[in-house]
Structure formats: structure tokens, C-alpha cells
């Protein structure tokens, strides 16, 4: 990463497969050091993280912003690649602790600035229960949406179609990455969400692609063949000793939305032309022409019906997430009057002058 570069991701999200978290694999590499934040809702964790992020930017550091899928305007974490250190909100639902306290991380409890004895505990319990119910309903709609995914239509794709997609991927890999050298150490594969289904709808960070890549291969994914292509790209790049970013699909995380290879300035994205940032060189790989067109026409009515139903389920999921977020905002409002924000601000100013990440 270059100095001053800012990228954005999600480390966890609600998906059709349930709550899907990637934070443990991101926080645990032995060369990384994370300060784990603790504290309740409304205790200033996201504000603290934004101040840390801004301080890193002001110092000319590359900054990775890890957004909260429950409230995309908030942050779950900040990471400084050049310093191999960062901060992360280690509270539920993404509870985490340093693997080796003092060696791989430390704690920072912002809850110490909260007068817990003054809290309305009955109100807190009621709001938490209602919020959980809306999230459960959202999860049910997301599960239904995943089940209606047209890419999984029975009889749409045959084994020879998958093999044709893999052959195309191998050809592109040979051109972009060459062959693995003898004794080459495998590269590292980092998994991060480029997009998530949130209370504001689908949030996608195309500027992150632009920050890492000058060229993008846009892959058709109407028939689900992009996964075959991306799996080959990811494995080949890693065998060639290249570090890659593998981004799961926001609805079906067992699928892949994108594979980025920053050191080569190239990315591979399953999506539509609207997903490609302006100014990037684009090559369109038309994978949807591989399955037999007669077969596709025969299934078109079923696929269109499933797609319509899926969009309705997704809209309902977003509405449930919106209601959950409104209740979470009410929950934060219960905590705020009990917080000593003046003391927290003073502490933050002092802490930012001493933490090695900034």
C-alpha cells in the first residue's frame, strides 16, 4: 500500500448463511498488533476509531477502515498496514481478545467512562430483546433470498460449462501471472467483504478496487460461473507467491465477489459494468454465453420469477435491519447521558500521542 492510501471493507455481515465474521483471521496473524476496544453502545468506540483513522491519514499512513455492517456510518476497526497495527471493536457480535496480551494486542476499555450505576437496565434489556427480534427476521429474509438465487437454478450449468470457465481463467492467469517459479513461497490470501447488505441497502466500496487496481476483469455471473473462474485465479496467484484479497459474496459468502492482486494492479470482479470504478481499464469476460442458450431460454421464466422474489426478500431484510438500527440508536441514547465524554476526549488525545500504530 502507498502512503496516504485509504481503503474500506466490512469484516463481518449478516448473510444468507447467517452472521458471517472474518475478524479472527484478520486480527490473528502473529506480525499484527491490535488494540481491542471494549465498552457498551454509545460509549464512543466508533468516534474513537474515526479519530484514530484521521490521525493516521494526517500522518501520511495508509489506512484500512473496517465499517460496521449494522450501521455503515460507524466503524468496527482501523488498521495501518505499514505499522502492522490497528484498533478493533471487540464487543458482541464480533467479540475477540488478543491472542497474546502484550505481544499481539492489548485492551482499551471505554466503558470505564460510563457511570453504569445510573443506567436504566430495564430499558436496556427491552431494547436489546426487540433489536434481536428484528435481526432474526432480517436473517430469515436473507436466508430466503439466498435460496432464491438464480445462479443455483437446477439444470442451468453443466460440468462442461464449468470446465470451459476454468480454461478461460487459466489462460488469463498465464498471461497475468505467468507460472509459479520453482521453490516460490506461496502468497497470502486475505478475506474481506467489499460489500454488505445493511440497513441502508447494499453498500459497496468500488473505490477500494480503484485504490488497488489499474485494470479490472469484469466477469458475467448470471449463471454462477464467475466462482469457477475466481477460484482458479485466487489459487494460481497464491501459488505464484502473490498476496491476494479475496472478497466473499455479501449474500452467499461461500461464493466470491472479487479477487484483487494489488502487487500486479489487477482485479477480477463478478458483477455488472456499474460496479467498475470510472477510469479503470476494463475487460469483460462473458461467462454467461458458455451454458447452452436453448437451456437458458427454457429456464428463463423460472430464473426471472426467482429473481423478483429474491429482490422482495432482500427489500424486506433491509427494512428489518433498518428497524433494528433504529432501536440500536435508542439503546445508545440510554447510555450517552451516563458517559463522561470530556474525560474520554482528554484520554483519547493523550492515547493517540503514545500508541505505536499512529
Residue ranges and their predicted role:
Residues 2-19, 54-119, 123, 237-315:
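Conserved nucleotide-sensing/catalytic segment adjacent to the nucleotide-binding pocket
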Residues 22-33, 50-54, 154-165, 182-183, ...:
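Short N-terminal helix-initiation segments at or just after the protein's N-terminus
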Residues 37-38, 48, 64-68, 100, ...:
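A cross-family "folded-core" feature that marks the main globular domain of proteins
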Residues 34-53, 200-237:
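Glycine-rich phosphate-binding P-loop
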Residues 2-59, 211:
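N-terminal accessory targeting/assembly segments
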Residues 1-26, 163, 167-208:
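N-terminal pre-Walker A segment at the start of P-loop NTPase domains
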Residues 123-176, 305, 309-351:
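An accessory alpha-helical subdomain
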Residues 4, 160, 356-358:
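Extracellular domains of the immunoglobulin superfamily
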Amino acid at each position: 500500500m502507498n502512503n496516504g492510501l485509504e481503503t474500506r471493507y466490512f469484516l463481518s455481515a449478516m448473510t444468507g448463511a447467517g452472521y458471517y465474521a472474518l475478524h479472527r483471521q484478520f486480527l490473528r496473524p502473529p506480525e499484527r498488533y491490535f488494540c481491542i476496544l471494549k465498552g457498551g453502545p454509545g460509549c464512543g468506540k466508533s468516534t474513537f476509531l474515526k479519530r484514530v483513522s484521521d490521525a493516521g491519514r494526517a500522518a501520511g499512513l495508509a489506512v484500512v477502515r473496517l465499517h460496521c455492517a449494522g450501521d455503515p456510518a460507524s466503524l468496527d476497526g482501523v488498521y495501518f498496514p505499514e505499522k502492522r497495527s490497528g484498533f478493533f471493536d471487540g464487543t458482541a457480535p464480533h467479540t475477540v481478545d488478543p491472542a497474546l496480551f502484550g505481544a499481539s494486542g492489548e485492551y482499551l476499555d471505554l466503558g470505564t467512562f460510563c457511570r453504569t450505576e445510573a443506567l436504566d437496565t430495564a430499558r436496556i434489556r427491552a431494547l436489546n430483546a426487540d433489536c434481536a427480534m428484528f435481526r432474526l427476521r432480517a436473517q430469515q429474509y436473507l436466508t430466503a433470498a439466498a435460496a432464491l438465487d438464480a445462479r443455483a437454478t437446477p439444470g442451468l450449468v453443466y460440468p462442461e460449462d464449468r470446465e470451459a470457465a476454468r480454461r478461460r481463467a487459466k489462460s488469463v492467469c498465464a498471461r497475468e501471472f505467468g507460472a509459479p517459479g520453482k521453490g516460490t513461497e506461496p502468497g497470502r490470501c486475505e478475506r474481506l467483504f467489499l460489500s454488505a447488505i445493511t440497513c441502508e441497502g447494499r453498500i459497496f466500496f468500488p473505490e477500494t478496487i480503484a485504490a488497488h487496481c489499474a485494470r479490472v476483469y469484469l466477469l458475467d455471473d448470471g449463471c454462477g460461473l464467475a466462482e469457477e473462474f475466481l477460484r482458479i485465479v485466487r489459487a494460481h496467484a497464491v501459488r505464484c507467491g502473490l498476496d491476494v484479497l479475496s472478497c466473499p459474496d455479501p449474500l452467499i459468502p461461500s461464493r466470491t465477489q472479487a479477487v484483487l492482486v494489488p502487487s500486479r494492479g489487477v482485479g477480477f470482479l463478478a458483477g455488472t459494468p456499474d460496479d467498475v470504478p470510472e477510469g479503470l481499464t476494463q475487460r469483460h469476460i462473458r461467462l454467461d454465453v458458455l451454458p447452452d442458450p436453448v437451456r437458458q431460454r427454457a429456464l428463463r421464466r423460472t430464473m426471472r420469477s426467482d429473481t423478483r422474489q429474491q429482490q422482495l426478500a432482500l427489500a424486506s431484510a433491509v427494512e428489518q435491519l433498518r428497524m433494528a438500527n433504529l432501536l440500536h440508536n435508542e439503546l445508545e441514547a440510554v447510555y450517552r447521558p451516563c458517559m463522561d465524554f470530556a474525560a474520554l476526549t482528554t484520554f483519547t488525545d493523550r492515547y493517540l500521542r503514545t500508541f505505536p500504530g499512529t
